[in-house]
Amino acid sequence: MTKKIVTLSGDGIGPEIMAAGLGVLDKVASKIEFDYDVDAKPFGGAGIDAEGHPLPKATLEAAKSADAILLAAIGGPKYDNAPVRPEQGLLAIRKELNLFANIRPVRIFDALKHLSPLKPERIEGVDFVVVRELTGGIYFGEHILEEDKARDINDYSADEIRRIMRRAFKIAQGRGKKVTSIDKQNVLATSKLWRKVADEVSLEFPDVTLEHQLVDSAAMIMITNPARFDVVVTENLFGDILSDESSVLPGTLGVMPSASHSENGPSLYEPIHGSAPDIAGQGIANPISMILSVAMMLRESFNETEGAELIENAVDKTLNQGILTRDLGGQASTAEMTAAIISNL
């Protein structure tokens, strides 16, 4: 059965890295007999330029009917003072598709260990996933700003916590069978509920070990002993901070993919880096995050584990051969890096 993939190339280096990702997908698809159609739609700044809105109606309708969505990058300086900004499109599509779970793998590549700000012994064996609740919590609560007083409401229901917990435990079943739930249970009421629901959900997964960490302790462990983690799950605010902290461990944003999942609808896959308008159009952008996002899509939306592993192994091999883009300390262009990965498939 042919799968429908909606592509949102967006802005800046987005079209360049999307082309790279689709080139790799095309090669892998021929090897694993994966049939798909691509439906390219404007989004972000490209949506504003085309139709005056970062999430045009036709783009949203296509996304809703897709089997998966690939997003490259959005934003740029031309929109800094605009009344409508590209980032509003990302918030809107998350809301419209109910993308409640953000998944960010954190892995250290042997060939890139020297880029990490941590000592080699600290990052040895680091391979974990941050699962962030994306649609609840303080970001979506009421925000009240008065003359000399302000407050923000942090609100979570047991059902919201339960669904993100179950997602984390299911991911852990396919990995190291360990979940670290992060909260601030010693202070916050929402965290007391968070921990209670985590304990309840853990009973549904007897093969997975659950541990609790306070967020301040977890932030320290992520630097002093990150290899301790397998699957980290936490609420929106803590996840926003900790996922960004974790992203510095590999020493570059250029090799980190991510996914955002709904309960029953399509998932969205994207690199964690931005649109890099300063190098757009020069053919020097690092496509690896986009290519690994394609691998995540194959595994998580289509259960094509073989295809995902082919891509991941090809990326490993390419880096080990010393083929590096400029952000990684080499001279390879976007096209050269992509061609090398395709060759190593």
Swiss-Prot record:
GO-annotated cellular components: cytosol
Enzyme Commission number: 1.1.1.85
Domain of life: Bacteria
Annotated InterPro entries: IsoCit/isopropylmalate_DH_CS, IsoPropMal-DH-like_dom, Isopropylmalate_DH
Subcellular location: Cytoplasm
Reaction catalysis annotation: (2R,3S)-3-isopropylmalate + NAD(+) = 4-methyl-2-oxopentanoate + CO2 + NADH
SMART domains for the chain: Iso_dh (SM01329)
One example GO MF annotation: 3-isopropylmalate dehydrogenase activity
Protein residues bound to substrate: R94, R104, R132, D216
Keywords, in A-Z order: Amino-acid biosynthesis, Branched-chain amino acid biosynthesis, Cytoplasm, Leucine biosynthesis, Magnesium, Manganese, Metal-binding, NAD, Oxidoreductase
Gene3D superfamilies, A to Z: Isopropylmalate Dehydrogenase (3.40.718.10)
Residues that coordinate or bind Mg(2+): D216, D240, D244
NCBIfam families the record matches: leuB
Function (record text): Catalyzes the oxidation of 3-carboxy-2-hydroxy-4-methylpentanoate (3-isopropylmalate) to 3-carboxy-4-methyl-2-oxopentanoate. The product decarboxylates to 4-methyl-2 oxopentanoate.
UniProt similarity note: Belongs to the isocitrate and isopropylmalate dehydrogenases family. LeuB type 1 subfamily.
Protein name, as recorded: 3-isopropylmalate dehydrogenase
Species whose genome carries this gene: Streptococcus thermophilus (strain ATCC BAA-250 / LMG 18311)
